């Protein structure tokens, strides 16, 4: 390594770049040594345009020194490569951006047979099972064009939105306990879901190792009033139309038959309950690290051995939060079906309002993967990334056995969204994972300071998009200018072969917290 010319033995930008090498037009490798103690290399997927954002962030970090803010995503990716039990590589997808501990858009898998392998709440995120569901209809854009303002208002009236929004799905503390344990089975039992909804949901809407006793009283207290609510931030319910079909066979299997077909996309997570589960676990894990002598490069990467009581407790509590998020999306699907039924004076069944699929973007799951020719049981952390299993995988629904698992990619407010399908190459390269959305390009703070919410709302109106927002001043944080271009992200994954484009959706109405 060349001479260090920055104070404190820090490397220059050029010296940092010596550790990064392009492997293919869409893939870079981070060599061991980029940060101390790397056990495996890092890999990140970017195209020419997205790599500029990645490297600018690194350059700013070098210029600024280790002062304030999150580390750049590429450093976070490398720090994850130092965790005990990590297998093969630490992976970042094209929508990657800095997060707490792990970057958002980071995938890492840990060997369940290694007694030192860890689980890290930072590798799942605070909004456990933040995810997306798409519901189809048999309506055409022309059926809703004249009434989209009314339809947006109807959705806004039906679905509780915003930061402190409270649910209208009645439940008691005992009901919450059951929902945490049962996930969508609870929704089905209570009449808020159709039996076939479960078939088209990752994990069939229920993590089986959920144990409500591992969820703190404080988390339950936060979760009880928020069941069936949308929340704020980047969460939304959007009425969309099919804009382009890239893979007719896959689209047909999803019940997507024509351009202009009306769809509904719901993006939400586990609200305050999931946040509290993560916070509680981080406190416990800091103690476990001291006890077990686990050292990490960044204290935000607090973790515990998977086999330890803290590791097991977290996985049980995380599963409860995941179940809660599926109940949440099911409740909102129920409310959304009601809103459409009222507006069109037809039953949701007559409107063909079936769930196409429901995916999680923030979760850790035990899966089997082939590593170096050997089948291994791994704990796969996906934070800001989506499971994308290939055709014929046993864990995807019968309907999608020939197409691969549908992967739902939400755009930013007012931009297009995509439905992709999983591929065999993704299974080999990224533990069956792909991107989850656009990925932030500006911090929330920067967006608030640089953008004007009235302008952002005006722009959406000029695009012909009906919008209902509970907290208008939070809109700047979610403006398209705050994010990377979702099409660039999706195309990078498509070109890399880790997922395949099937359908493009365009928004006509947005409901936001």
UniProtKB/Swiss-Prot annotation:
Belongs to the RtcB family. Binds 2 manganese ions per subunit. Mn(2+) 2 binds at residues 130, 267, 361. PANTHER family: RNA-SPLICING LIGASE RTCB HOMOLOG. Catalytic component of the tRNA-splicing ligase complex. One of its GO terms (molecular function) is GTP binding. GMP binds at residues 234-238, 361-362, 410-413, 417, 436-439, 512. Its EC number is 6.5.1.8. Catalytic subunit of the tRNA-splicing ligase complex that acts by directly joining spliced tRNA halves to mature-sized tRNAs by incorporating the precursor-derived splice junction phosphate into the mature tRNA as a canonical 3',5'-phosphodiester. May act as an RNA ligase with broad substrate specificity, and may function toward other RNAs. Keywords: GTP-binding, Ligase, Manganese, Metal-binding, Nucleotide-binding, tRNA processing. GO terms for biological process: tRNA splicing, via endonucleolytic cleavage and ligation. Mn(2+) 1 binds at residues 127, 130, 235. SUPFAM superfamilies: Hypothetical protein PH1602. Its cofactor is Mn(2+). The active site is at residue 436. The keyword Nucleus does not apply. One of its GO terms (cellular component) is nucleus. Ligation probably proceeds through 3 nucleotidyl transfer steps, with 2',3'-cyclic phosphate termini being hydrolyzed to 3'-P termini in a step that precedes 3'-P activation with GMP. In the first nucleotidyl transfer step, RTCB reacts with GTP to form a covalent RTCB-histidine-GMP intermediate with release of PPi; in the second step, the GMP moiety is transferred to the RNA 3'-P; in the third step, the 5'-OH from the opposite RNA strand attacks the activated 3'-P to form a 3',5'-phosphodiester bond and release GMP. It comes from Micromonas commoda (strain RCC299 / NOUM17 / CCMP2709). The lineage of its organism: Eukaryota, Viridiplantae, Chlorophyta, Mamiellophyceae, Mamiellales. This is RNA-splicing ligase RtcB homolog. It comes from the Eukaryota. It catalyses: a 3'-end 3'-phospho-ribonucleotide-RNA + a 5'-end dephospho-ribonucleoside-RNA + GTP = a ribonucleotidyl-ribonucleotide-RNA + GMP + diphosphate; a 3'-end 2',3'-cyclophospho-ribonucleotide-RNA + a 5'-end dephospho-ribonucleoside-RNA + GTP + H2O = a ribonucleotidyl-ribonucleotide-RNA + GMP + diphosphate + H(+). InterPro entries: RtcB (IPR001233), RtcB-like_sf (IPR036025), RtcB_euk (IPR027513).
